[in-house]
Amino acid sequence: MTETEAVKLNDINEEGLIDKNTKNKGLNNKIVYSLFGVIIVLIIAGVILLLLHKNKNDTTQKNADLVTAFFKDGYENKNFDKVLTYMAKDYYDHSPASARSNVDAVNILKTVEKMYSNVTVEMLDLTCQNDMVAARMKFRMVHSGEVSGIPATGKTITFEALENFKVVNGIIVESWGYWPDKQIEEQLKKKNEQY
């Protein structure tokens, strides 16, 4: 680098730019254009990151809404045709219920319908991360059909259940659940107690 190309410390003015009175006016313009280019790139990158974050939040909310709709339509509204559309045809339930398709899952819901009436589901917690949705629900229902050899008692029972769902492209593909079967059975066997 020759002396005419080099920027000397005494050529820089108070604003941090090369003094206009120096021989290096062209270099001053190059710095300004370079800074302008960097600023434009940073703005574009920021906009892209905001859009990606917004899209992730939209997907997370859609996944949460899907899981909520599954419980509301499956247990409360008994809209089984709609529930079929919420799950993949090869839906896989890792819980003891062992549904291996969306049709199996709906058949389980239909079995529950024969045993219980006036079912309400309160979503207590709903946590979403990436393609996973964790739900904690409180069920309240009337025992109106035979369950595990126990004839209908008319009792209202309540219990909490946990369920984790994997959602891909807006469809539930897998689930892992905990249902307190023993607690439910104990409530049904107790005489004249409502829960």
Regions found by a protein language model. Name each.
Residues 132, 158-186:
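Short beta-strand edge/turn micro-motifs at domain boundaries
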Residues 21-33:
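Short, low-complexity patches enriched in S/T/P/G
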Residues 145-148, 183-189:
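A short, polar/proline- and glycine-enriched secondary-structure boundary/capping micro-motif
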Residues 31-90, 191-195:
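Short, low-complexity N-terminal intrinsically disordered segments enriched in polar/charged residues
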Residues 1-23:
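Intrinsically disordered cytoplasmic terminal tails of membrane proteins
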Residues 80-85, 89-133, 138:
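A solvent-exposed, acidic/Ser-Thr-rich amphipathic alpha-helical stretch
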Residues 138-169:
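Exposed beta-sheet edge and beta->alpha loop/turn motif
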